[in-house]
Amino acid sequence: MSLIPITFYFLFLFFSNFRGVFAVPNIHLCHFEQRDALLEFKNEFKIKKPCFGCPSPLKTKSWENGSDCCHWDGITCDAKTGEVIEIDLMCSCLHGWFHSNSNLSMLQNFHFLTTLDLSYNHLSGQISSSIGNLSHLTTLDLSGNNFSGWIPSSLGNLFHLTSLHLYDNNFGGEIPSSLGNLSYLTFLDLSTNNFVGEIPSSFGSLNQLSILRLDNNKLSGNLPLEVINLTKLSEISLSHNQFTGTLPPNITSLSILESFSASGNNFVGTIPSSLFTIPSITLIFLDNNQLSGTLEFGNISSPSNLLVLQLGGNNLRGPIPTSISRLVNLRTLDLSHFNIQGQVDFNIFSHLKLLGNLYLSHSNTTTTIDLNAVLSCFKMLISLDLSGNHVLVTNKSSVSDPPLGLIGSLNLSGCGITEFPDILRTQRQMRTLDISNNKIKGQVPSWLLLQLEYMHISNNNFIGFERSTKLEKTVVPKPSMKHFFGSNNNFSGKIPSFICSLRSLIILDLSNNNFSGAIPPCVGKFKSTLSDLNLRRNRLSGSLPKTIIKSLRSLDVSHNELEGKLPRSLIHFSTLEVLNVESNRINDTFPFWLSSLKKLQVLVLRSNAFHGRIHKTRFPKLRIIDISRNHFNGTLPSDCFVEWTGMHSLEKNEDRFNEKYMGSGYYHDSMVLMNKGLEMELVRILKIYTALDFSGNKFEGEIPRSIGLLKELHILNLSSNGFTGHIPSSMGNLRELESLDVSRNKLSGEIPQELGNLSYLAYMNFSHNQLVGQVPGGTQFRTQSASSFEENLGLCGRPLEECRVVHEPTPSGESETLESEQVLSWIAAAIGFTPGIVLGLTIGHIVLSSKPRWFFKVLYINNSRRRRRTRSEKS
C-alpha cells in the first residue's frame, strides 16, 4: 500500500471528526419571517430628528432587506436557533401611531422575545390586550412616548417579567390589579402618567419588588400596608399625587430602604421617627404635605447615611431637635415653613460638616438671624435660603474672619434688609442672588453684574448702579448674567448702556421704574438669547427699535410714551407669544401682518392711536386680544373670527411638564384686563384663559355671527361702540363665557334666550342700547342688578319690571338658532370649499360651452316647475 493514499485517509478522518470546529456559519442566521416582520414594523413609522437629545445613532438605518437581521442595530438573536430574543429601539427617533393590533401582531412572530424596548421615541396610540401573548418577556420598556388609554390587564399574564417601565406617557384609568401576578417583578415604573384611583392591594404579592415608582400621577387613597410589607424594596416614589392618610408607623420593616419620596401629597399626622432609624436610608422627600406635630429623629444609627432630608412646606412646629447633629453625612436639609416658635440655634448644625444646601425660609422665628454668623458657621455651604425671616446685616469696615466664599446661591427675599450686605463681596463663587422685596436703598454694586448669572433685586429702593460709567468701559468678553430682575425700584435716567454688555441675557425685567429716553438699539445684540423683555411702566419715548430678536418670546413695553408705528421687523420674531404695547402713543393701522407669527397668543394694543378697519385675518393660536380704547372703525366682516382657532377649542397639552401659566419657571407674563366691569391685573396668565376686548372704538354694523365659534372665550367686551342690529344668538355657543359687556351700543331686538343657558356667565351688561322684550329667565340673569339692563326702554322682566303681556315664544327664535348654527358651519367650511368653487366654475364653463341647448332646457323646465309650485302653495 502506497504512502499517499494512507495519508489522505487519515486526513479525511481528522477533518471528519473536527468538522464542527471548522464549520462555516450560516450566511442567514435570522429567520426570514422575523426579518420581514421587523422591516414591516420599521415602515410603520417615520424617522424624525432630534429625539430627546439621545446620542445614539438611528438604529433602524441598518435594517435593510436581504441582510441578516441578527446583525442589525438593536436586534439580538439566539446564537443557536437564530430566533430574535431582544428588540432594543430606545432613542430611535420613531414617530407615528402605534397600531396595537397590526404592530403587536408583527411582534408575535417573535415567540421567544425576552426584551422589548421602545423607550424615548414619539409613539402614540393605545396598547391592546394582545401584548399579553408575548409570554417570554422579561423586560418591557415603553417609557418616554405618548401612549394613552388604559393599561391592559393582560400585562398580568407576562409571568416572567422582571422590569416594567411605562414612565412618561399619557396612560390613564386605574392601575390593573393583575399586575400583582408578576411575582418576578423587581422594577416597576408607572410614574408621570395620568393614573387615578388607589394602589392595588395586589401589589402586596410582588415579593421580589425592589423599585416602585408611582410619582406624578393622580393616585389617591392611603398607602397600602401591603406595600410596607415588601421587604426587598429599596426605593419608593409616591410624589406629586393625591394620597391621604398617615404614614405607616411600621415602615421600619423596609429594612433595606434607601429612598422614600412622598412630596406633594396630602399626607397628615406626624412623621414616624422610625423612618430615620432605617440604617440604609439616604433620601427622604416629604415636603409639601400636611404633616404636623414636632420633629423627632428617634434612635438614629451613628453615623447616619442620610444625605437628603426635605420636610419643607408642612405644618411642623417646635424647635429643631438637637439630635439633628447626628446626621453627619447630610448634604441637603429643607425645613422651610417650619414653625420654629423660638430662636434658631445654628450651633446644632456644627457637626453637619458636609451640608451644602440649607433651606430655612419662613421659619417664624422670634429672633433675628445674623447673616454673618450663619455664613461663618458653614464651611461647605453652596445654597442658602433664609427668605421670609428677619435677617440682620452688619456692614463693618473689615471682617476679622471672613467666611469661605463657597456660596453659589443665596435667597434673602423679604427679610427686612435696609442696606446691601457687604459680606457678599467675599462670596466669589456666588452665581444666584435674590434680595427682592426688601427696603434696600442706594446703588447696586457693580461687581454683581460681572459675577452673577441670576440677580433678583426687584421691589427695593435702589436709585442707580454704582460706578456705572466705569462699568460701561469695562470689557467683559464672556458676560455671565442671564436673568436680571430690577422691577419696582427708583431707577431713573436712560437705561444704562452696560446692559448691552450682558450678551447672555435671557430675561431682562426693568418694569415699574422711572427710566426715560429711547430704548437702546443695542437690544438687537441679544437676538439669539433674549426670551423675555419687560420695560412696562417707565417713561420711555421714541419708537420701538427695528432690530430683530428672533429668540424673543415676550415683549412688554406698555405704559410708556412710545410713538410712531409698530416696526414691521416684528414679523421676523418667529417665537413671539406675547406682545403688549398698551397705553402708548402708537399711531398705526391694525397689524394684520402679525398673523404670520404662528405662536402669538396674547396681543394687547389698548389705549393707543390705532385706527382703520378690521379685516378678516388668521390668528391660529391667539387667545387674548385687547384693542380697546383706540380709533378702529367700520364693520366687522361676518367671517371675522373663523380662523381664530385658538379660541375655538383648547389644544391638548402633550407636555405635562409645561407650566400652567404663560412664561417659565423664572418669569411669568402679566397684564391688565377689563373683567366684569373692573380693571383686573393678571399677575400670571393662565394658559387656558381667553379674552376678546374691542370696546371703546367706533365699530358699527352687526356683531358677526362667527363670534359664536369662539367656544372657549371667557371674557367678551364689545361695549362703547356703534354696533347695530340684533345680538347674535350664536353667542349661546360661548359655553365658557364668564363676562359679557355689550353696553353703550345701538343694538336692537331681544336678548337671545340662548344666553340664559350659559352657566358660567357671572357678569353681563346690556345697558344703553335699544333692546326690547323679556329678559331671559336663566339663573345667571336673575342674579344681575337692574343697572345691567338700564336705558333699554323696551326691556322687561326680572330684575326689571314685570312684562305686562307675556307673549308666547315665537318659533323664529328656534329657527334663528338653527339658522345661526348652519351659518357658522358654512362660514367655517367656506375656506375648504374655495378650491371646489373654482373647480365647479371651470366645469360649468365647459358644460355650458359644449351643451348649451339641453342644459338650458332642463334648467328652464325645473325653474318653471318650482315657480308654479310656489304660486299654487301661496294661493
From Swiss-Prot:
Compartmental location: Cell membrane
Annotated membrane topology: Single-pass type I membrane protein
Keyword Cell membrane (UniProt): yes
Pfam families, per database record: LRR_1, LRR_14, LRR_6, LRR_8, LRRNT_2
InterPro entries linked to this entry: Leu-rich_rpt (IPR001611), Leu-rich_rpt_typical-subtyp (IPR003591), LRR_dom_sf (IPR032675), LRR_N_plant-typ (IPR013210), LRR_R13L4/SHOC2-like (IPR055414)
Alphabetized Gene3D superfamilies for the sequence: Ribonuclease Inhibitor
Cleaved signal peptide residues: 1-23
Transmembrane region(s): 823-843
Chief site of localization: membrane
Stretches in topological domain Cytoplasmic: 844-875
Superkingdom as given in the UniProt entry: Eukaryota
Keyword set, alphabetical order: Cell membrane, Glycoprotein, Leucine-rich repeat, Membrane, Receptor, Repeat, Signal, Transmembrane, Transmembrane helix
Cellular component, GO annotation: plasma membrane
Repeat positions for LRR: 110-133, 134-157, 159-182, 183-205, 206-230, 231-254, 256-278, 280-302, 303-327, 329-351, 352-377, 378-401, 404-427, 428-451, 455-477, 479-502, 503-528, 530-549, 550-573, 575-596, 597-619, 620-643, 686-710, 711-734, 735-758, 760-783
Glycosylation sites: 65, 103, 133, 146, 181, 229, 250, 299, 364, 395, 411, 490, 514, 587, 633, 717, 757, 765
Residue ranges annotated as Extracellular topological domain: 24-822
Family, similarity comment: Belongs to the RLP family.
Protein name (Swiss-Prot/TrEMBL): Receptor-like protein 33
